[in-house]
Amino acid sequence: MPNVSVTSNTRFGKSVIVRPGTTIGHDNIIGAHTSITAGASIGSCINIGEGSFIGLKACIREYLTLGKYSMAAMGAVIVKDIGEGELWGGNPAKLMRIAKWKEVAST
């Protein structure tokens, strides 16, 4: 599983990290300083805000928006939009907490 698969018309911001085994669909926008961990599966037409974190083997359904500094926990199945600074986890994913801006500023 050492490969990353990215299909057409996906745009990456500066300093994006994509780990092995990740699949990324078409027509996505991935914001600067985002980290996508191993085995994540990202659908198509998704807008991921800057500074976001996609956990190990998380799945994100197509046509969604993840706000700046949002987080998808390990194994999360994201089927709804995520707001800025929100942490979602589970299957289907639910809001677990909202980051305090002091926490975001320290990352």
PLM segments and residue spans:
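Structural signal for interior beta-strand "rungs" in well-ordered beta-sheet cores
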Residues: 1-89, 93-96
